[in-house]
Amino acid sequence: MKQTTIARRVETVGIGLHKGEPIRLVLEPLDANMGIVFHRTDIGASFKAEPANVVNTQMATVIGNEKGFISTVEHLLSAINGYGIDNIRILVDANEIPVMDGSAISFCMLLDEAGIKQLDEGKKVILVRKEVEVAEGSKFVRTVPSRNPKFDYTIKFNHPVIGEQRYVFEFSKSRYVKEIARARTFGFLKDLQRLQAQNLALGASLDNAVAIDDTHILNPEGLRFENEFVRHKILDAVGDLSLLGAPLLGDYIAFAGSHDLNHKLTLAVLADEKNYEIATLSGELLKDYQKVFA
């Protein structure tokens, strides 16, 4: 199997979650072995999507360096990882990725418009060789070896609308689009009011998030899935794990995970070469994992 990029340049415009202003997003093809590269056109700064460039994980995944940063990259990265795209250049004219509808489906549609192009180099993957776990109290994220990669996620909120939810997602492109990509981000009204008082989340609305008060969902259309909340957590994890630089072939298991724990997991996996193996997807290995990329 070969590495991929997009076939043609595409662009869109969307609102930024925090500033509430229009942002121009452009996706461009990139050569083999270049990975995922972000570029801020407004300040002329580039950042490679990798764990070392993560600078904040409090409310979103933020990458950057001394020249600047780009916030809320996880939904776009999730779509890119879900589509198995290895190399792509992402250009934005602001310090955040547009929120679109709060899910990854708009980015999937943009990738469909761009098309997928195979390159000459073999596709690299990260095979999980040992269990790796990062925990904080009862919360944890872990990855374990598996020939049938899946995301097994449980969330637990002391809230009547959410409660405890678990979803197991067997990874493949087709299932990603059907089961995960449309799940929207969610937030509590009391938190939104606090953030907007700090001039943050100014672009948040019922058009780009599931909003919850003390007892109800505020969106008139309701949920897209009965368990949309936990599905969105999987969406985030698919995006955060893309920072490893290649598809992770192993199970991801989480209880009450977060962007911060996901980031710490990527660092922990890469910290010891006994934890993983970088391999080219071919021969018997390709046969084992073919359906992941279907």
Swiss-Prot record:
A matching Pfam family: LpxC
Protein name: UDP-3-O-acyl-N-acetylglucosamine deacetylase
GO BP of this protein: lipid A biosynthetic process
GO cellular component term, pick one: membrane
Keyword Acetylation tagged: no
Purpose: Catalyzes the hydrolysis of UDP-3-O-myristoyl-N-acetylglucosamine to form UDP-3-O-myristoylglucosamine and acetate, the committed step in lipid A biosynthesis.
NCBIfam families, per the entry: lpxC
Family: Belongs to the LpxC family.
Residues reported in the UniProt entry to bind Zn(2+): 75, 232, 236
